[in-house]
Amino acid sequence: MDEGPHLITDPAVFESYSQDFVIHAPYHGMNIASLFESIRRASVEVMIDCFAIASEIGAPVVMHPGYHAWNTEKEAADRQFEKSLHQLQESAADHSLMFWFENMGELNYFHFRTPDDIPSLGDTGFCLDCGHANLNHCLPAFLETDFSHMHIHDNDGRTDSHSAIGEGTIDFHPVMAALERAGATAVLEVKDLEGVLVSKRLLESL
């Protein structure tokens, strides 16, 4: 997560580790679909700064697709998103990296909440967030799509709790089957270390 106390300012921090990395771009204060052009441009610039660091360590980037404040602004915000998308695609090509948009939670001002929104991403891949899809009651439909990466966590279908596997209502048997079929990468996005360890054991037993 490239923000707050985890803001990445120097890719050298990764040199001590042998893991493969996926960087989640900053999202607080960011809106690549903003109707305020200065905010949209600044948000894109922050994403491109993230691309520059990610390219140094060979990591793909996950980002949020933006949001709109009022339903009457949705079409205009979609056009702003499309403008940002083209700029981000050009920058990703310049940096020789992949980036993916994450499907968002249940709040209706978010862009990209259901599989119906996938065409708006063009030829850019996406990160299937299982918990967010569960909140929007469309996880089975998402599992039938061609996703590139997956965020794994559980919830009760009402709150984006990022709970450990088994603490919510998601059936992870079809989730793991879809992950294997897609050949996608995945990360556990559980709120604490104990939950990560429990989740890892349960997923390995499936």
Predicted regions and their residues:
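Active-site acidic/histidine proton-transfer and metal-coordination neighborhood
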Residues: A33-G125, R181
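Conserved short-loop catalytic and cofactor-binding motifs
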Residues: N31, A76, E106, D160-S163, ...
